[in-house]
């Protein structure tokens, strides 16, 4: 939206019962190119990066140029408004909630709204009796004559009082008395809230500020119950409770130990009618707080350049205050001096503390200007980093390995604990499972800077170069009183022999461990955290140093749900969509993929609405609503882009399988119930985890397993028995473990063992010298038992075999393959016709063909594979017939055209269309014989009776 033309205006509050804006059209025409009276819709926001409002403003030529009057929208009463033209999206559907009042006729309500081409927004009140519940396809658009309305009547709005502004409170006007309130802590503290532009803000409801005679942007004072005062700059925030305020996190901490001035539950205070004393700062002294970023010469140089310029642009500061400067590390490392480039797309932060402000102790709060002298002290500050509350912290608290790390770090960084013990944690797991995210989130909570080094940086380095690099790294670490030393990718340091064993004695490892030992001083609090993909590849020298090993697996459903709640917080999802259903569809997705999923969904929604004729800007400003279709498109797009997919879901539906209705019902009941109603199994009831499909070959066992995965949106892994076997001792069992481990990580998942009898025969009967088959069966039994005990991992195992009598009997005991489903031959004509319909649904059949009649002519012993062969032969027969017809046409034309040239010239003619006729099927039937004889079928029936 960078090309959208905007103009700035000063907003003024207007006491009016309506929700509207007034502006001088004459001024707006001059100030805003593209503004026309006949289409006078405009978009207003206090900041181009946050959502605003669409208005059809009322013309008031008496208003001063550059001003806008606003009523009913306190969140727009800021220092300035950005105004731009917009073509609002027309609403297709609106659902209203109306208080049940007989005097309000439903049709009259709709006509009144349609008649004035109202602009509606989800969760807005049209008046005290009507709430806009749902809008489609955007949350903020214009009504026209074609908009469909649905009205739901209710007895009352119990929440009306807290949502609607009471205009009588504004009419009381300015008072000179203090206002009682509660200071609420913010749920999230991110680096952006600590920037210079935000570090002194106090977020106040408009009516509270108005009633003490203050304006947005003016200095205010809060007096706490213990007599202390907090000073800051008023910032109107409409979603704040009417009797509470929120402080910028920078205003919480003013002492060396970062003790917050407010409690977690909230602190009672007064908004003092008399404001604080304010003066110009003649000189400000700043020190950097030790973090890894500040030890980068180029990053620090770029940050110092930015902080000098930003401080000179009138910011409000107090002594002992902390703030940060965001920096684009790529631009900083390229020695750029362009402030705009350095502060755009930032990914690094340099923290500063205000040491002194001159004139000393003269004012409560100071503001800066171009004449303010800024001193950047080269000595590091003794202050600790502030405690951040990043959005992912809620996820950390429900993610078991992150939760353990959080608990250990809380105990270690407790100031009441005596320092001296420096633990070593080893985090291991597949890539993109959240190891780095967990460390960053936990560290931010405990004010501990993270000093990161990757093993790739010194894997091939010489001993001298490595020692020099690590010496500098350690020197920077010890400058901070507490820190986390984060060593990534430790398995890079391992050296393997030809037999696959880890060779000890790597020089790099010895140097690394010796340097880490230098950090472990009795005075400091330092935690060492290492990461790796596989703990089996870690040298024993490192394993002997680690105190705790935490395994990071693929995200489970409830963990993905918590992440989606965080990442999807800033997008608009259709209220009919459950995030739990979305989480079910995102199995095996990583942190990064879930983080970018909301952006993909928004793009899909914009693309969908854009096809109706609106431009990108209008759609985005109107708030596109994400539908289920957008969710599916986005998930499929991410899966296609994913290069390391573990398993894929096959595209086989129930409709693709003819017959087998009994088997379908059993599988649906067995597998679908624990997925849809997990609460049924929360009281100790164990869901069935194993199903064995047995019967003659060609009856659809593999196809049925694929359909289960597709219909229930499960990951699917198909294992042919011999694939697991390996010539080396222990490798076959390891292969079995790996299959189940990956399935657990990708739950809900289906493991399909085809030809199960080839890897799980009777134990004791194998002729191999190492008893490999017996060990594989034992490992398989252990894995089946483990998944049946874990209610939180939805892993279903489906086995398929022609000979269940050859299987080890232990596999068929309760808790393993305890449900046996026989897939026999569909002898009924109705079942065979159903199979034919499923197999030929993509064919172009002759209009006169009757599949029921074809089914009558089929042999009773035809299996599903035989029916597939019948259809394939019928297609080949049709192709031969059509080829002969074309040859005759070429001969009749008297030309020397080849068959290919003839097709090119006549490709659009209906006469070339290939249609399957009854004769094609009958020709194929004459040649086809059942693949299973009567004797074999009799033997399978005996096996069925044995296991039924």
Curated annotation (Swiss-Prot):
ATP binds at residues 695-702. Signal peptide: none annotated. InterPro entries: AAA+_ATPase, AAA_ATPase_domain, AAA_lid_3, ATPase_AAA_core, ATPase_AAA_CS, P-loop_NTPase, RecA-like_PEX6_r2, Spast_Vps4_C. Gene3D superfamilies: 1.10.8.60, P-loop containing nucleotide triphosphate hydrolases (3.40.50.300). SUPFAM superfamilies: P-loop containing nucleoside triphosphate hydrolases. Pfam families: AAA, AAA_lid_3, Vps4_C. Disulfide bonds: none annotated. It is found in: Cytoplasm, Cytosol; Peroxisome membrane. Coiled coil: none annotated. Interacts with PEX1; forming the PEX1-PEX6 AAA ATPase complex, which is composed of a heterohexamer formed by a trimer of PEX1-PEX6 dimers. This is Peroxisomal ATPase pex6. It comes from Schizosaccharomyces pombe (strain 972 / ATCC 24843) (Fission yeast). The lineage of its organism: Eukaryota, Fungi, Dikarya, Ascomycota, Taphrinomycotina. The gene is pex6.
């Amino acid at each position: 939206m960078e090309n959208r033309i905007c103009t700035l205006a000063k907003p003024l509050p207007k006491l009016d019962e309506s929700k509207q804006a007034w502006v001088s059209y004459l001024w707006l025409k001059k100030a805003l190119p593209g503004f026309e009276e006949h289409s006078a819709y405009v978009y207003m926001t206090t900041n181009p990066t946050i959502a605003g409002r669409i208005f059809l403003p009322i013309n008031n030529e008496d208003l001063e140029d550059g001003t806008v009057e606003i009523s009913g929208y306190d969140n727009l009463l800021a220092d300035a408004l950005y105004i731009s033209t917009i073509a609002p999206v027309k609403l297709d559907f609106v659902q209203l909630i109306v208080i049940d009042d007989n005097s309000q006729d439903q049709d009259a309500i709709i006509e009144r709204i349609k008649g004035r081409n109202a602009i509606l927004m989800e969760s807005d009140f049209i008046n005290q009796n009507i709430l806009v519940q749902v809008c489609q396809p955007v949350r903020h658009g214009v009504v026209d004559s074609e908009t469909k309305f649905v009205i739901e009547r209710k007895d009352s709005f119990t929440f009306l009082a807290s949502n609607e502004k009471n205009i009588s409170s504004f009419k009381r006007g300015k008072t000179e008395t203090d206002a009682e309130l509660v200071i609420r802590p913010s749920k999230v503290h991110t680096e952006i809230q600590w920037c210079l532009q935000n570090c002194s803000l106090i977020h106040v409801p408009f009516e509270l500020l108005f009633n003490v005679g203050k304006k947005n942007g003016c200095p205010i004072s809060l007096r706490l119950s213990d007599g202390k005062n907090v000073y800051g700059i008023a910032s109107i925030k409409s979603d704040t409770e009417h009797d509470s305020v929120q402080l910028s996190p920078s205003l919480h901490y003013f002492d060396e130990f970062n003790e917050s001035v407010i409690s977690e539950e909230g602190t009672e205070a007064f908004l003092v009618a008399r404001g604080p004393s304010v003066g110009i700062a003649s000189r400000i002294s700043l020190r950097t707080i030790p973090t890894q970023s500040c030890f980068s010469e180029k990053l620090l140089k770029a940050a110092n350049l930015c902080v000098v310029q930003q401080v000179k642009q009138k910011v409000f500061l107090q002594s002992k205050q902390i703030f940060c400067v965001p920096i684009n590390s790529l631009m900083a490392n390229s020695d750029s001096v362009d402030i705009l480039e350095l502060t755009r797309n930032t990914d690094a932060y340099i923290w500063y503390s205000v040491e002194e402000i001159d004139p000393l102790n003269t004012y409560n709060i100071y503001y800066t200007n171009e004449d303010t002298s800024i001193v950047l002290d080269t000595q590091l500050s003794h202050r600790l980093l502030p405690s951040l509350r990043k959005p992912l912290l809620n996820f950390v608290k429900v993610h078991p390995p992150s939760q353990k790390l959080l608990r250990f770090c809380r105990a270690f960084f407790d100031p009441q604990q005596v320092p001296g013990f420096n633990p070593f944690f080893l985090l291991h797991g597949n890539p993109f499972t959240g190891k780095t995210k967990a460390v960053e989130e936990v560290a931010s909570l405990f004010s501990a800077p993270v000093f990161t080094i990757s093993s790739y940086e010194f894997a091939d380095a010489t001993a001298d170069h490595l020692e020099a690099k690590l010496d500098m790294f350690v020197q920077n670490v010890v400058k901070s009183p507490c820190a986390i030393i984060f060593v990534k990718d430790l398995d890079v340091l391992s050296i393997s022999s030809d037999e696959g064993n880890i060779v000890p004695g790597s020089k790099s490892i010895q140097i690394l461990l010796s340097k880490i030992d230098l950090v472990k001083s009795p005075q400091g609090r330092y935690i060492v955290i290492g990461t790796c993909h596989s703990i089996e590849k870690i040298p024993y020298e490192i394993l002997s140093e680690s105190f705790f090993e935490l395994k990071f697996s693929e995200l489970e459903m409830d963990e993905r749900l918590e992440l989606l709640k965080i990442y999807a917080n800033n997008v608009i999802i259709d209220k009919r969509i459950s995030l739990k259903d979305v989480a079910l569809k995102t199995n095996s997705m990583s942190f990064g993929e879930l983080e970018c999923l909301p952006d993909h969904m928004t793009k899909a929604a914009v693309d969908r609405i854009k096809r109706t004729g609106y431009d990108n800007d209008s759609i985005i400003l109107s708030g596109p609503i994400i539908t289920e279709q957008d969710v599916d498109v986005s998930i499929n797009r991410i899966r296609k882009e994913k290069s390391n997919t573990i398993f894929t879901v096959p595209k086989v539906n129930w409709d693709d399988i003819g017959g087998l209705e009994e088997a379908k019902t059993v599988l649906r009941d067995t597998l679908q119930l624990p997925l849809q109603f997990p609460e049924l199994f929360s009281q100790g009831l164990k869901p069935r985890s194993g199903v064995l499909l047995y019967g003659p070959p060609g009856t659809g066992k593999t196809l049925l397993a694929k359909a289960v995965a597709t219909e229930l949106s499960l990951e699917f892994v198909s294992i042919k028995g011999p694939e697991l076997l390996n010539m080396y001792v222990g490798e076959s069992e390891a292969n079995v473990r790996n299959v189940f481990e990956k399935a657990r990580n990708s739950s809900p998942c289906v493991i399909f063992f085809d030809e199960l009898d080839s890897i799980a025969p009777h134990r004791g009967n194998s002729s191999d010298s190492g008893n490999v088959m017996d060990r594989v069966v034992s490992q398989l039994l252990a894995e089946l038992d483990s998944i049946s005990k874990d209610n939180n991992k939805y892993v279903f195992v489906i086995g398929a075999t022609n000979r269940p009598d050859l299987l080890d009997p232990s596999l068929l005991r309760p808790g393993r393959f305890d449900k046996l489903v026989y897939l026999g031959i569909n002898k009924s004509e109705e079942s065979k016709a159903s199979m034919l319909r499923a197999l030929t649904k993509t064919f172009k059949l002759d209009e006169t063909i009757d599949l029921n009649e074809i089914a009558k002519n089929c042999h009773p012993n035809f299996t599903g594979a035989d029916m597939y062969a019948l259809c394939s032969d019928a297609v080949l027969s049709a192709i031969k017939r059509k080829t002969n017809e074309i040859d005759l046409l070429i001969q009749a034309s008297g030309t020397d055209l080849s068959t290919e040239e003839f097709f090119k010239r006549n490709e659009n003619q209906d006469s070339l269309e290939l249609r399957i006729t009854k004769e094609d099927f009958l020709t194929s039937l004459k040649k086809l014989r059942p693949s299973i004889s009567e004797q074999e079928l009799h033997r399978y029936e005996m096996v069925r009776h044995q296991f039924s």
